[in-house]
């Protein structure tokens, strides 16, 4: 993100790409302005939260008018560094890793997986989704400073060991899909996504909703 942007809550930062994607669709349809209520309906975030999110960046809209789509799109493009491609390395070409390589963020043109690593000799030296797969032993030789982000879809026991090597190579951010909780220096940002935990959480809330609907 732009170094000049204000410090904002993590929850707000996570919603910015949602706003940006919807604004791109609005712009493509030729719409010139949008209200917080319309944004709310599209991204499933209440209008008050949207207005609060936008307030961190100053006056982005006018009361009674709403928001100028072109202006917002341009603003968030700069805020999210959409004009620059962020190269990503993926570790672990199993089922989940293969799905990532085939998808490769086709709806997000500024993010691209450019290389993958695995230890399976049947996968090493080949391409998956047009992305070359290297042996994990080649990490130090292949990974360069232009790749700031790594995705981990490896077995949990290997996650910390690979992370330590990534830190040594100057990686800045890790999207961790393993159950392992990684130990990294403070300047490294890690987002943990445990699919089992997310599913259990969803099932829990479904159970709670069903309980209250029966009362």
UniProtKB/Swiss-Prot annotation:
The entry's DNA-binding region: 18-57
Chief place of localization: cytoplasm
Binding-site positions, NAD(+): 92-97
GO BP, one annotated term: negative regulation of DNA-templated transcription
GO CC, one annotated term: cytoplasm
Assigned keywords, A-Z: Cytoplasm, DNA-binding, NAD, Repressor, Transcription, Transcription regulation
GO MF: DNA binding; DNA-binding transcription factor activity
Family matches, as SMART domains: CoA_binding
Subcellular location: Cytoplasm
Gene3D superfamilies: NAD(P)-binding Rossmann-like Domain, Winged helix-like DNA-binding domain superfamily/Winged helix DNA-binding domain
Stored HAMAP family: Rex
Subunit field text: Homodimer.
PANTHER family: REDOX-SENSING TRANSCRIPTIONAL REPRESSOR REX (PTHR35786), REDOX-SENSING TRANSCRIPTIONAL REPRESSOR REX 1 (PTHR35786:SF1)
Function: Modulates transcription in response to changes in cellular NADH/NAD(+) redox state.
NCBIfam families found in the cross-reference section: PRK05472.1-3, PRK05472.1-5, PRK05472.2-3, PRK05472.2-4, PRK05472.2-5
Family: Belongs to the transcriptional regulatory Rex family.
Protein name (database record): Redox-sensing transcriptional repressor Rex
The organism of origin for this protein: Geobacillus sp. (strain WCH70)
Gene: rex
């Amino acid at each position: 993100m732009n170094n000049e942007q204000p410090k904002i809550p993590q929850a707000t930062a996570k919603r910015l790409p949602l706003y940006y994607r919807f604004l791109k669709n609005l712009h493509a349809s030729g719409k010139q302005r949008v209200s917080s209520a319309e944004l709310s309906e599209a991204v499933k975030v209440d209008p008050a939260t949207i207005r609060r999110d936008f307030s961190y960046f100053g006056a982005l809209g006018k009361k009674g008018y709403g928001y100028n789509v072109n202006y917002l799109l341009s603003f968030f493009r700069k805020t999210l560094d959409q004009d620059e491609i962020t190269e990503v390395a993926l570790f672990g070409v199993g089922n989940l890793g293969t799905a990532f390589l085939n998808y490769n963020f086709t709806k997000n043109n500024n993010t691209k997986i450019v290389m993958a690593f695995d230890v399976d000799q049947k996968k090493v030296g080949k391409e998956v989704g047009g992305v070359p797969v290297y042996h994990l032993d080649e990490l130090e030789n292949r990974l360069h400073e232009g790749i700031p982000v790594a995705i981990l879809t490896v077995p949990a026991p290997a996650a910390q060991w690979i992370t330590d090597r990534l830190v040594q190579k100057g990686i800045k951010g890790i999207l961790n899909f393993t159950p392992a909780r990684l130990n990294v220096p403070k300047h490294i940002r890690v987002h943990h996504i445990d699919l089992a935990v997310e599913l259990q959480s969803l099932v829990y809330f479904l159970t709670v909703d069903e309980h209250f609907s029966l009362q």
